[in-house]
Amino acid sequence: MSDVQVSDHPEVERYEISVDGRRAGLAAYELEGDVIAFTHTEIDDAYEGQGLGSQLARAALDDARARGLKVKPLCPFIRGWIKRHEDYQDLVVPTT
């Protein structure tokens, strides 16, 4: 079984997911006050189809919740993931 880890790298504004110590993908964001805007998510081609995008989204959103942040899902992947997981919809910043 592979060792999968998600970590926040605030100095470059992104969460990274790694498999056995190798970066497999990222979720880029911009942080403004108490709002985190996810702008781009990507998984390396070598790791596609393994559910890593979902693991990355869940971990990043769980971290946002723990930090008391609201989410602006600009990235289509994160936006779609939240739509499919009702228990995360409360994190989304209402649009005006």
Where do the model's predicted regions map?
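Conserved N-terminal entry element of GNAT/NAT acetyltransferase domains
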Residues: 1-8
